[in-house]
Curated annotation (Swiss-Prot):
InterPro entries: HATPase_C_sf, Heat_shock_protein_90_CS, HSP90_C, Hsp90_fam, Hsp90_N, Ribosomal_Su5_D2-typ_SF. This is Chaperone protein HtpG. Residues 563-637 are annotated as: C. Its main location: cytoplasm. NCBIfam families: PRK05218.1 (NF003555). Gene3D superfamilies: 3.30.230.80, 3.40.50.11260, Heat shock protein 90, C-terminal domain, Histidine kinase-like ATPase, C-terminal domain. The gene is htpG. Residues 346-562 are annotated as: B. Disulfide bonds: none annotated. Pfam families: HATPase_c_3 (PF13589), HSP90 (PF00183). Belongs to the heat shock protein 90 family.
């Protein structure tokens, strides 16, 4: 007796099923990933249960998953010889959304079996993804250890109900036949199915097989007979996960080949880290540092992240939740035993487990970079040339690791007058003068502009090293990285130089004397430039240049203003502080000028020169040229 019955889905919500079928997954081909994953689950369940009762194997312990297509009938079939289902479990588990036999099975495991289990079907709705491409789904199954006549047929069109019927099934396990919708017949193609299996299920430990047609006897090119070959089931996936093997058993060549496989990069990786984490969270990570920056590294619309596997089954590319944005160049994967996922597996749940994994993986990458910088400085310089600007985003994004990130940064400096960015903050501190308590830096549009800035004159004279920053992100960086190892970073173009103990008494006395003698000059310049500057004062930083402009404490620097303007952000009105060098011949000439109009023109000319030196451009270059020509003509008359 067939005992055919019709049941309504226990959720009793046809609309929910339809919504899930059409909206839950972001691409249709995922149906095969889900069904192959379920089949692998069934094999794993049988493997574990057979440890204590090997009669469940029924004389066949070669577990496998098989996928086949029939173009004429428009069907795709996925079968396994795993644990199978009884009639009751079919009704319970295939009749309820978000109910999973695997999850229930998993909760009953304990000890080492639980740790090593590769049961991935804790999501409850994977089976129903079949209806994304199928107008009808037929399931034939028999539980291991049960008689052949205890097989079950389950069939549904995904319309809110399903039929269940008892059948005879000689082989244990489950066979799922998808009757494809007319518009989805592309999936009834062996090549299409092979490509999906390779993409999503390459590293499932259970062999995934497809039928390889035999060939008839034929004539060779020289007339010889070529023997016929028989058709056979051929394994499509590697059926091994490299990252689950012992590190000592994996060669460098294997690591590099695997990197190329997952990254689609043609060149070798620079470095990698393969690590197994056990404890509260259990996962394996295999992280690669590329040798070259990917072409899309600066594309903010493109997702960057790690491949995510759960129990060796590919879940998604570009899982962004496990690394901060400033490490978006890292390639690799994570394979979790207990990672919580949303039911669709498409969106990771943002919770404490995910956060803890992110913290651990971030520390792992930073540790890898620190080791590279220490042990292979030349290799690290190659890395820095490719990814340094991205790493500079770190202090703003990752407060907890700010000090570690700062230790990885490299800059040009006045130490060797080279444009090469090879100087670490650690090395700078080691070379600091006795009594120096600040790390001095300058940010400019180019290395040349930074290296030749008049703001460096006194510091060069005293032999004080200055970091030369000239990348667009540098101003953003120093706004978030204000100190390193208790040494404050101090801009030489902002406020006072604050030399502290580096300023000897004789210099200070000389400066104070010049400032006192120049009070009248300062007042005249203030009056002449009242609309253009916020303050005029005697400089303490210039030795060879007549004047310069600096930003006041708490005011935006020139570079930050440029950044804001480039981003289309409103910039508050501000006027610079104008510093003059009374010992310079041009300023002495200015001081001796009795004609107030000429005095104002000279003062304005010096200001425009200082602004040009600082900004690289002027708001009104034509007016500056006119003024310059006017002063030149006056001097030759």
């Amino acid at each position: 007796m067939s005992q055919q019955e019709t049941h309504g889905f226990q959720t009793e919500v046809k609309q929910l099923l339809q919504l899930m079928i059409h909206s839950l997954y972001s691409n249709k081909e995922i149906f095969l990933r889900e069904l192959v994953s379920n089949a692998a689950d069934a094999a794993d369940k049988l493997r574990y249960l057979a440890l204590t009762d090997d009669t469940l194997y029924e004389g066949n312990g070669d577990l496998r998953v098989r996928v086949s297509a029939n173009k004429e009938k428009g069907t795709v079939t996925i079968s396994d010889n795993g644990i199978g289902m009884t009639r009751d479990s079919v009704i319970e588990h295939l009749g309820t959304i978000a109910k999973s036999g695997t999850k229930e099975f998993f909760s009953n495991l304990s000890g080492e079996a639980s740790k090593d289990s590769q049961l991935i079907g804790q999501f409850g709705v994977g089976f129903y993804s079949a209806f994304i491409v199928a107008k009808k789904v037929t399931v034939r199954t028999r539980a291991a250890g049960h008689a052949a006549n205890e097989g079950v047929l389950w069939e549904s069109e995904g319309e809110g109900s399903f039929n269940v019927e008892s059948i005879t099934k000689n082989e244990r396990g489950t066979e799922i036949v998808l009757h494809l919708r007319d518009e989805e017949t592309e999936f009834a193609d062996d090549y299409r199915l092979r490509s999906i299996i390779t993409k999503y299920s390459d590293h499932i430990s259970v062999p995934v097989q497809m039928w390889n047609e035999g060939t008839p006897e034929s004539d060779g090119p020289d007339g010889e007979k070529v023997a016929a070959t028989e058709g056979e089931w051929k394994v499509m996936n590697k059926a091994t996960a490299l990252w689950t093997r012992n590190k000592s058993d994996i060669t460098e060549e294997e690591y590099q080949e695997f990197y190329k496989h997952i990254s689609h990069d043609y060149s070798d990786a620079l470095k990698w880290s393969h690590n197994r984490v056990e404890g509260k969270q259990e996962y394996t990570s295999l992280l690669y540092i590329p040798a070259k920056a990917p072409w899309d590294m600066w594309n903010r619309d493109h997702k960057h992240g790690l491949k995510l596997f759960v129990q060796r089954v590919f879940i998604m590319d570009e899982a962004e939740q496990f690394l901060p944005t400033y490490l978006r160049f890292v390639r690799g994967l994570i394979d979790s035993n207990d990672l919580p996922l949303n039911v669709s597996r498409e969106i990771l749940q943002d919770n404490q487990v995910t956060t803890a994994m992110r913290v651990g993986i971030t520390k792992r990458v930073l540790g890898m970079l620190e080791k590279l910088a220490k042990d292979e400085p030349e290799q690290y310089q190659s890395f820095w040339a490719e990814f340094g600007q991205v790493l500079k985003e770190g202090p703003a994004e990752d407060f907890a690791n700010k000090e570690r990130i700062a230790g990885l940064l490299r800059f040009a400096s006045t130490h060797d007058n080279s444009a090469a960015t090879t100087v670490s903050l650690e090395a700078y501190i080691e070379r600091m003068k006795a009594g120096q308590d600040k790390i001095y830096y300058i940010v400019a549009d180019s290395h040349e502009a930074a290296a030749n800035s008049p703001h460096l004159e006194l510091l060069r004279k005293k032999g004080i090293e200055v970091l030369l920053l000239s990348e667009r992100i540098d101003e953003w960086l120093v706004n978030h990285l204000t100190e390193f190892k208790d040494k404050k970073l101090h801009s030489v173009t902002r406020g006072d130089l604050e030399l502290g103990e580096l300023e000897d008494a004789a210099d200070k006395e000389a400066h104070d004397k010049v400032a006192e003698e120049s009070k009248g000059l300062i007042e005249r310049v203030k009056a002449a430039l009242a609309d253009s500057v916020s303050e005029v004062r005697v400089t303490s930083r210039l030795t060879d240049t007549p004047a310069c402009v600096v930003a006041g404490e708490g005011e935006m620097s020139t570079q930050m203003i440029k950044l804001m303007q480039a981003a289309g952000q409103p910039v508050p009105e501000s006027k610079p502080t104008f510093e003059i060098n009374p010992t310079h011949p041009l300023v002495e000439h200015l001081n001796n000028e009795t004609d107030e109009q000429l005095f104002a023109d000279w003062a304005n000319l010096l200001l425009q020169q200082a602004l040009l030196s600082e900004k690289g451009s002027l708001a009104d270059p034509s007016a500056f040229i006119k003024l310059t020509n006017q002063m030149l003509l006056a001097s030759v008359k």
